[in-house]
Each structure stands twice: as structure tokens, then as C-alpha cells.
Amino acid sequence: MKTQPEIFDVFILGAGPAGLCAAIRLLDMGYSVGMIEQEQFPRPQIGESLSPGIYNIFEYLNAGHLLEDSMYLKNISARVIWEDAAHIYDRPSQDKGGIIVDRSKLDQQLLKFAVSKGLYLIQPGKLKQSVSSENGWLLDIINDSVEIKIKSKIVLDARGRKGTLLKERVPIAPSAIAVWTHIESNAVFNEAFIEAVDDGWLWGSPVSGNRYRIMAFTDPILLKKNSESHLLDLVNKTKLFSPLVDKIKSGLVQTCSVTSFVNQNPWNNQFIKIGEAAFTLDPLSSTGVEKAMRISLQVAIAINTYLKDPDSKHPKDFYEEKLIESVVNHAHWTADYYRNAWVCGEKTEFWMKRTNFQLDISKNKTDFTLRLEKEFNKEKPKFENKQTEPIPVDFILYQLWNEEIFISPKVAYKATYAINNDLIELKQALIHPNLERPLVYLDQVELFPFFKNINGKTVSSVVEHLSKFMELEKSKKILVFLLSNQVFIVDKNMQKSKWFF
């Protein structure tokens, strides 16, 4: 084992994907990082279905090779009954469209990869207590009956749902429970199933070990009978799963809570919740591992900024702002998706709650949850569907080549957080009704400095200026994007350019 430093820069509780992603990123930045994991690896873990974005994250961590395992299942097609009870939608497989992994194996390999980079690991170990101090945190850890004292400037809690007390959880969706089991696959069942029924919905997929998992998501109140009977009832109501009902074996049905929540105080005096200790997703999205790792990448940037400037308020504000954005976007997306289910109009416990859910922070009022409530209840702007056909860039620029362009009067600016060289900075972001979100950068070009002297310049001179520090084709695409969204206009007395309607 490595020599324990006098004080860690960061100490992480939990060796799941969120904690390991943060550890690897921080180690690459040159920080001393320690970790405690309560269980011995390998250990069984559900959550094997990883969304397509996971490839980019593993490549970013230089760990893409860990996903290249012949036993992992890729390019799985799906059959879906959701919007129309009478119609089965066949979703074809896609290259790098998701992957089914063996989490016990992948987590162990990712941990080994982090240790090879310099991670100080205590496993198995249990946190006895944590005490805030002048220089960070003092942790008492039990390892094989031996008490270990740890000092760390920052603590990351990546212990999953058990890292958040019930009283700290703010539900962002109605309560839900998963009831699940495995049946033998024998390569017969090689596609995923998703189906909505009156008391919830079901997901099925082949997983490692020649097994097929059947998982039902329902309201806890509906579990009046034992879980096995309830699962069988739900399966019998389906078209896709009902042929499998005789393969479900008695005594092998399990349950777990899948209620989506956010922690009421995710950054508390440099004790920071990440992954599912901070925010749990509705299983409908099937992006839980990816989102947890993305949050870890964001917190690594925040920690890097904090350790270089402990007096700055930017790291905490940035992390909480990004977390709120993720929570709100996810909650609204899942609510819309549930509303599209054919059974949503049914007066059943599960679907009525999802139609009428209201965020309630009355028992969890903190600065963070008050900001969350404001964003959660904000009316979402509506954007017209953009033209999907390719824009004829050269043709448009040729028509406007000698025209003078001006910044639209609808353009505004606001200070917002941006990342520059792994540090958080305040930048001026561009706001316009046609843009879905404030823009600081467009294709890695900072917009505010570019806008300073644009008024009255011809299209040709703007292209010439941009092409001095970027490829010509890139400069043309940026300019046409701004023109097509009426951020730039040709006639300053008009609200939009004459070539865009």
C-alpha cells in the first residue's frame, strides 16, 4: 500500500463509478486522493445497462479499453409498447448504442485502474465518524478492527443512496419501487423489452451470466401482496413479457427503492455529495451511471478551482448550478415521457401521481432547495422545431457577401460560469430568444469578445477575420449559425435577416 499522506487533497467514500471517475480525474490533475470502500470486490451490482454516452466518458479517462470485453453485450435491439397499447415499436440495434456490462467486473477493473494511477485505497473499510476541522475534515475509519485517522481538505461522498439520509432527500418524482428477478436466457431472449401497464411499466434485457432480467417499476402502495405475486401479476398484464411468466422461479424475486431524489445540501463545508448520494435518476432514463460520472467530472473541475483559490465561491455555486440544471431537465423529461404513455389517462395510483406531481421542499428548505424550487417551477421556453435539412452555408454567404451585419436588438448578455483550462471562470454569455440556452462558446470560440466590434462589418470581412485563427469552413459555419438564428441581422432596422424566415 502507498504511504498515507499527512493530509489528502481529496478523500472519497465509495468505489462505485461516480467515486472512481472523480478519483481518476483528480489524480490526473496531480492531487493526492484517498478512498474507502466498505465491500470487498468483486461484488454483485445492478445497473449493468449503460447508455451510449458512457463510451465518451471512459475514453476521456483513458479507460476505454475496459469496455472492450467480449462478454459484454452490445448493439441490443428493443421492442417497446408505450404510446400505443396496440403497437409494438421495434427499435433496431445501433453501433455504440449502449452496452450491457458485468458491473462487478467493470467496477473492480476501474478501481484497479485508479489504484495504478496513485489512488490510496482502504478496502474493506467503514467510516466511523467525520468531523469538520479548520483545515478540512477528520475521518475515523475502521479497517479490519484497526482504527485509521484520515485528514483531508475535501471529502466526496460517493456511497450511493446509502450516502444520503432519508431526511436529507428531496423527492423530485413520485415514490417508486423496482421488483425484479432473472430467468435463464440460453441466448433465446436476445433483445430488450419495455412495456407500460396500468400499475407501472416493465423492462427486460439480457445481462451477463446467460441471464435475462425482468424488472417491474411500480408504486410502493401497490405492493400489498408479496413481491413475487405482484411481479407475476404485472407480467401477466403484458404482451411482451407474458410468454416468460412460467420461467420465473419462486423465491428469487428481489425489490429495491428507485425513488428519484436530490440531496438538500450537496456541498456542505467541503463535504460534497456526488453520484447517487447527490441525485438519483428515474430508471426510465437508463442513464444513471453515465449521469453520475458526468457529475463527477464537473465536481473535479470545481475541486480543482477550490484548491487553487479556497476563498472563491465559484466552485460551490458552479457545482450546485450544474446539479440543479441536471435535476430540472431530468425531472421534466421523465414527466413528459410518462405523459406520453398510452396508460397515462388511467386512474391508477402509479400514473395519476406522475401526472400531478409537485415539488415540495417544505421539509427541506435550504439555500440549495430554494434555488432548485425556483428553477423547477419556471415555465419552460418553447422553441420552434429547427429545420433539419442541411443549411447551404456557401450559398447563403455568397448572397450576403457584401452586406453589413448587425447584432440583433434582442441579444442580451449575462455573467455565467464557464470552464477554461480545468478552472471555473465567470464569462459573459449570449442570450437570444432563438437560442435554447445562454452561449459562452460556439464550437470552442468565445462569443463575447467576437461580438464587440461586429456592427457594420461586411460578411466578407467577418469571415476573413475569423479565418485568421480557425479553419475557414469552421468560421463560415459559425457565422451562418448566428445569422440563421437571427442573432446577427443584415438590416439593423429589421428584426431578422432578409434571407431567413
Question: Across the structure, where does each feature detected by a protein language model lie?
Answer:
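N-terminal FAD cofactor-binding segment of flavoenzymes
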Residues: 43-79
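Predominantly flavin-linked oxidoreductase catalytic cores and closely associated redox partners
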Residues: 113-244
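Short beta-strand to alpha-helix junction loop
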Residues: 93-112, 222-226
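C-terminal helical "tail/cap" subdomain of flavin- and related membrane-associated enzymes
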Residues: 304-397
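Glycine-rich FAD pyrophosphate-binding loop
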Residues: 11, 27-46
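Acidic, low-complexity/disordered tracts enriched in E/D and polar residues
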Residues: 370-454, 476, 480, 489-501
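Beta1/beta-strand and adjacent pyrophosphate-binding region of the FAD-binding site
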Residues: 3-16
